[in-house]
Amino acid sequence: MPPKKKVAGLIKLQIKAGQATPAPPIGPALGQHGVNIMEFCKAYNAQTESQRGNVIPVEITVYEDRSFTFITKTPPAAELIKKAAGVEKGSGEPHVKKVANLTSAQVREIAEQKLQDLNAKDVDMAARIIAGTARSMGITVSD
């Protein structure tokens, strides 16, 4: 078994799927660790091409020899909620002004999609987390 590589850093970014470019914020974040920026952009764009239009969080592990690996996550809950509710952004005053309404079925669908990234054992708990996020954005959840 080859010796394990030493980790030099962990970078977390949220990038639109299929649209990674060397421009900020990606370039400077990777450049300070000495990573080949174009190599990352090409690999990321190829892996996320099918999810175009979504913001995809990515965790990049940089090793001391300047090589890297990355893991893509599911889109942020807030992005999925905004898409399902059909709003541009959440409410400026979440508990005063309500901007949209989601059904329990929509919340459950988002919870099933996010389950692997959430700290929840089952879909019901994940749905409660998603409903809480929606409430904090000024979006009501109805049955």
Curated annotation (Swiss-Prot):
Forms part of the ribosomal stalk which helps the ribosome interact with GTP-bound translation factors. GO terms for cellular component: cytosolic large ribosomal subunit. PANTHER family: 60S RIBOSOMAL PROTEIN L12, LARGE RIBOSOMAL SUBUNIT PROTEIN UL11M. The keyword RNA-binding applies. GO terms for molecular function: large ribosomal subunit rRNA binding; structural constituent of ribosome. It comes from Kineococcus radiotolerans (strain ATCC BAA-149 / DSM 14245 / SRS30216). Part of the ribosomal stalk of the 50S ribosomal subunit. Interacts with L10 and the large rRNA to form the base of the stalk. L10 forms an elongated spine to which L12 dimers bind in a sequential fashion forming a multimeric L10(L12)X complex. The gene is rplK. Gene3D superfamilies: Ribosomal protein L11, C-terminal domain, Ribosomal protein L11/L12, N-terminal domain. This is Large ribosomal subunit protein uL11.
